Amino acid sequence: RLGPLWSLPSDAGSKTGLSDQLRLGHVSESALDDTIAMRVRFEGAAPRPNQLYFRGPVLTWFDGQTWSVRAVPFRQQAEADGGPVVQAQGRAVSYQVTLEPTRLQSLPLLDGTLAASPTPPQTEPEMRRWGLDWQTRRPVGERIQVSGQAWLGARDTTLERFGRQTPYLQLPAGVNPRT
């Protein structure tokens, strides 16, 4: 038997947490969600609590109404094409994260992760790094495991290289930069 055509799946609404966009006037539609998003296991000593920042989707594109994740062709190589350059600094930390499905291409990995791969190797998802942000070719629709290595003092030098011309600061024509 089929359900009504006008019903939505129970998980169709947005939730607090990861999203690939934020639209003006739609923030109140989010609902609190206390489900587990990920589990992390460190090899050796875990970083201090103030170093446990997991970088998820970075909303770098603004069209005047909606902030969203900047679309970068998956095949593009960051440094070869003038993209972000990251300097590995600080203590290296190896870890494994089990991520629940997000339906997003962004992977919330420990900030400063410069090396990551699915566990076991040769399995989905295909992953790539753009600066300090990690993405998959397709949205993550099932639980995945990723092994990563992060440098706790890694720096993205994009702003130093491009100054105010960085895409993170671009606004559409006609938008007042003070609003």
PLM ranges: what are they?
Residues 1-179:
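Helix-boundary/low-complexity linker signature
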